[in-house]
Amino acid sequence: MTVTNTYNPTLFFTRVVFQRITKFTAKANEENEILFYALFVADLCLDMKGGLIAINKPSGRTSAQCLNELKKIISNSELAQYFRPAPPHPNDRNRRRRKSNRLPDIKIGHGGTLDPLASGVLVVGLGTGTKQLSSLLSCMKTYRATALFGCSTDTYDSAGKIIKIAVHIPTKEEILSGLDAFRGDISQLPPLYSALHIQGKRLYEYAREGIPLPESIKARSMHCEELILKDFIPKEEHTYTDPDEFASKEAIESEELLRPIEGGAERHDLLAKTEQDINPQDGDEKINAKSPTTNSVTDVAKDQTVTNPKKRKFEVTDLARGSRPAIGPIAVLDMTVSSGFYVRSLIHDLGRQVNSEAHMVDLVRLKQGSFALDDENCFDFSEFSAPGWEEKLAAAFKIDLKGDETS
């Protein structure tokens, strides 16, 4: 995060003065031309600076909400001038379409979305640092996830509604054994409630509107470098509870259509090749695949090398009664995974792997690339609403707010 631009006190003072004038003074376009020429020249000498920082995103907020709030805070600070791009040249035709007395917004972006439920490392690029964010797309990430066994939900986490109650509660030994199927290179089916696109529309939009998917969801190749059971807590010793609401039959059927077969390693072998269909008497049509990597059950049946998948039993007896499910144990998992990995899917699939049901109740991103949650330079999001954050951020980018860059 070293800043290499040479600071010129005179030009810096000129730039700040003209910024204040253009912000608070409404003048004719002809008079503002002089101000824009001066501001343009000053910005050429005081180039935009920037870099990458890590913030600890709080649970309950989206990554976009955090970024918008951070943008507003920094834009109203002294540091904003360092993260704004140079204004357009006065002869630029597009400039005349903009408000003549408005400064450019600061440049800000993040290097990978975290679910609203999740907390932890969110890498933020400021100024020129936004150009470095693409380097984070392929880096490994480390998470600590908490799985609650006993039921599965439509969103695969605690924010969703129950779709199935477990008839078997796994032991610690069963979970340890079940983790073996998810290490190394695996195929992973993304959750229906995700931001992936199918034909220009996000998956969660189809789910919320109750619209059938126009094509099947493709299984994706992922890599799990490390997966360990950090802790196992029996149901009598933790305070987590299952969701209170049960999903509708339509939502359950949508989930049934996504999952090829129930449980076991057989599911992972067929994941990239099969699509499950509900029994014909249930009145649901099959989802036909349009990709070479995900075929319908009919296509798989033609392949003599693949065993015909079992039809999944569709049970809603407990859901129809509206009874509260039994609470199972929790398993705390530490994992280092490739980019694009869905931790929710791993937990959901782990539940099926041990002949049970599970959903995610907590997720913390511990590390992304070289940025770690326990680094002293990682900002807690609450710091930006307390005094002293400007000095800490300036120090991170080696900027002296008094006028000179630090070495």
From Swiss-Prot:
Molecular function per GO: pseudouridine synthase activity; RNA binding; tRNA pseudouridine(55) synthase activity
Keyword Isomerase among record annotations: yes
Localization annotation: Nucleus; Mitochondrion
Modification Phosphothreonine, positions: 293, 406
Span list, region Disordered: 83-105, 274-298
The organism's place on the tree of life at top rank: Eukaryota
Main location: nucleus
Gene Ontology BP annotations: mRNA pseudouridine synthesis; tRNA modification; tRNA pseudouridine synthesis
GO-annotated cellular components: mitochondrion; nucleus
Catalyzed reaction equations: uridine(55) in tRNA = pseudouridine(55) in tRNA; a uridine in mRNA = a pseudouridine in mRNA
Active site: 115 (nucleophile)
The entry's keywords: Isomerase, Mitochondrion, Nucleus, Phosphoprotein, tRNA processing
Pfam families documented for this protein: TruB_N
EC identifiers of the protein: 5.4.99.25
Enzyme class, spelled out: isomerase
SUPFAM superfamilies noted in UniProt: Pseudouridine synthase
Positions where Phosphoserine occurs in the chain: 291, 296
Gene3D superfamilies for this protein: Pseudouridine synthase
Family note: Belongs to the pseudouridine synthase TruB family.
Function: Responsible for synthesis of pseudouridine from uracil-55 in the psi GC loop of transfer RNAs. Also catalyzes pseudouridylation of mRNAs with the consensus sequence 5'-GGUUCRA-3'.
HAMAP family on file: TruB_bact (MF_01080)
Protein name, UniProt field: tRNA pseudouridine synthase 4
